[in-house]
Regions:
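Active-site phosphate/pyrophosphate- and oxyanion-stabilizing loops and adjacent acidic/basic residues
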Residues: 49-50, 102
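C-terminal lobe/tail of nucleotide-utilizing enzymes
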Residues: 77-145
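ATP-dependent carboxylate-amine ligase catalytic core
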Residues: 1-46, 53, 67-74, 78, ...
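Glycine-rich anion-binding loop/nest that anchors nucleotide
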Residues: 64, 68, 92
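A contiguous pocket-lining binding segment that forms or flanks enzyme active sites
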Residues: 58-63
Length: 145
């Protein structure tokens, strides 16, 4: 998308910008959403996986709870492990699929299922968070919620 818009992503500028935003947000956590997936290139020679390996942030992996999620999510977890990165949690978004959740739960410290929130706004997110121990789990609490 950046190339199509005539933009160049400089990993050094990204690093400096993130550092400034983390400092501004402190002590609150800063959420950074990656675009697309782990192997999406930021430059022709630098992927989002490379960026994560360099920055070493706390990672919460979000995946669709649908057909194909086992392969896609397990491949992503394998790619993270190859870089010595371990997600704090996995959030499966969509209709619950007990078999998928059970299979993936064995590979992550914490697993949560999130229904489609409509409308997707602050009130819907706050309502879901009020009923789920995700923040505690990501910081080091319960196993699965």
């Amino acid at each position: 998308a950046a190339a199509a818009a005539g933009k160049v992503i400089d990993p050094e500028v990204l690093h400096d910008s993130l550092g400034a935003r983390v400092a501004e947000a402190a002590p609150a956590p800063l959420v950074v959403e990656l675009a697309g997936g782990l192997q999406v290139p930021l430059t022709p020679a630098f992927t989002q996986a490379d960026w994560l390996a360099r920055e070493r942030p706390r990672i919460v992996l979000v995946a669709r709870s649908a057909l194909g999620t086992l392969n896609h999510t397990l491949l992503t977890l394998e790619a993270l492990r190859a870089r010595r990165l371990t997600p704090s949690a996995l959030i499966l978004v969509g209709d619950p699929h007990a078999e998928n959740a059970a299979t993936l739960a064995a590979h992550v410290p914490h697993l949560f299922e999130l229904p489609i929130l409509a409308p997707l706004d602050r009130a819907a997110i706050d309502g879901w968070l009020a009923d789920h121990p995700i923040a505690e789990a990501i910081r080091g609490g319960t196993k699965h919620g």
